[in-house]
């Protein structure tokens, strides 16, 4: 699925249903691997996150292709993805379950929030976790991580099928996140 729209009514209904209930409903329909493993909320008291997935895939960093100067490149896949993520979408990052370097930090999360993003999910770590927890954007990650993403992650593909926390995530899949974690519909 390349794009998905979700009605306000559906978004509101899903916002009232726990991820546990959604997982059981999906399991009854034969879908067993829909929970994103290891992606926990920075602030479990934030409202439930609901929106279509917009994805970014990281691969292991190669030092000669991933120097600090790439941050100056507006065409860099990470920067480009942040600017292309549609309002109301959930930005989902495949960090290969590696939290040793951040998937993003407060600058990018603030930009996504200002652009109307419904939330952020990674199976990796985040820089500036305490600052991000104060932002008005639901955010899910494995753990805080101070090193910049460039030390271990190289942004590669935008809005393609990814694996996040061992769950398949296709662009446009509906992501629901609450205090227990995130599920892919």
Residue map of PLM features:
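Feature captures the catalytic cores and cofactor-binding loops of soluble hydro-lyases/lyases
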Residues: 1-171, 177, 185
